[in-house]
Amino acid sequence: MIQRILFIILLCLCSTSAFAQMEEALAPLDYALDSAETRQLRLEVDNMTFFKDNEFSGTVMKGCTLPGLWVTPKLTYQPLRNLKIEAGIHALIYSGAYRFPNYAYHDIAQWKGNQYQRGAHLLPWFRAQLTLRRVHLVLGDLHGAMKHRLAQPLYDPELMLTADPEFGFQLIADTRPAHIDAWVNWESFIFEGDTHQEAFVVGLSSRFRLNSEQSRWHVYLPVQGTIQHRGGEQDKGGSVQTLCNGAAGVGLRWNVGHKVVRYIGAEALALGCAQQKGKLWPFSGGSGLYAKVDVGFKYGLSARLGYFRANQFITLLGSPYFGAVSTKHDGACYPDHPQTAHLALDYSRTFGKHYALGAKVETFCNAPGRMRLADGTMQNTTTTFNTSFGIYLRINPSFLLKQF
């Protein structure tokens, strides 16, 4: 009863999803091509320097500290008004790390024997983008990570600091009634006789607008999903795995127009997951509920508190606090409707077109219920308060080298 009262109090006090302002500053939707850059050769440097500290307790997941940066210097050339080509190198660096595991990063990488790179985790970077009116086709490195605008139970923003850039194919359609982002992210390629599995993620993030975003009361319908497939024709050993996440709901945004409060928004999502093939998850399927309310203030301040409840729901790319399995204890899960109340306060500020600063404090009040261990035994758990703090500096300067 105490846990239920605590959740209700937290939800009523601050139910906000104000990460929107910080998203706009640190991960802007900058996929539109600029016709003024036609036939220009430019040097661009895309960088984020960060310090993030996760102080987590309990049985769900481990805490960690991420001090570092990633940087992508690249040459860009736009031969046509609607065609842009970019090529460069992506480097991920953590302070105090001098050797980096040499394989694909889907999260914080695990050490892998003598297969490593020195100084940084390096990857080639290439993107070709073609724009046809309101449709953008992308091959190579995608407009990914937080730019997909996936709900937090489906995508953990921390992956922007730990995972490799997404690579594959992407289609973005931005029309008056809808914004649609569909993509394939190829995570792992296998050669003949390889010992690991082929893996890729198919994703959809869409928002259907029932009226104009500038309306005083804006109503929209979000529909999102991710599917991960593991195994392929070259894979002779491991079993095929197909795992799915989905979300659909309704959102409301009140554009207040006050000198202090910019907007207040609310969103409710029904969540679902399914294990179509394989036995990687302890449950074959599940569902969940996620509700949030947004408040955006002047001067780049915003706040959020959301509420999550799971019924055997397992997240593919989201934080374990939005799911029913433990990443701290192998094979452990939570069959008794785990719940999480999430409060976030953030600040963001842009400096001109190419520079942005962000800071964020989060608290997760997690009540997972009983934990079922890998051997089938049940173990009681307690409600925990877990905090996270991060500060981020994003720079993306562009230098004209030659006009053809």
Mark where each language-model region is.
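Surface-exposed loop and membrane-interface regions of Gram-negative outer-membrane beta-barrel proteins
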Residues: 83-130, 152-153, 318
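Surface-exposed strand-loop-strand hairpins of Gram-negative outer-membrane beta-barrel proteins
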Residues: 48-70, 100, 114
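Surface-exposed coil loops of outer-membrane beta-barrel proteins
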Residues: 136-207
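Sec/Tat signal peptide C-region and signal peptidase I cleavage site
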Residues: 16-20
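Transmembrane beta-strand segments of Gram-negative outer membrane beta-barrel proteins
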Residues: 29-54, 85
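Sec-dependent N-terminal signal peptides
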Residues: 2-14
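Exposed, low-structure sequence patches enriched in small/polar residues
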Residues: 22-23, 46-50, 68, 125, ...
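Cleaved targeting-peptide boundary
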Residues: 21-29
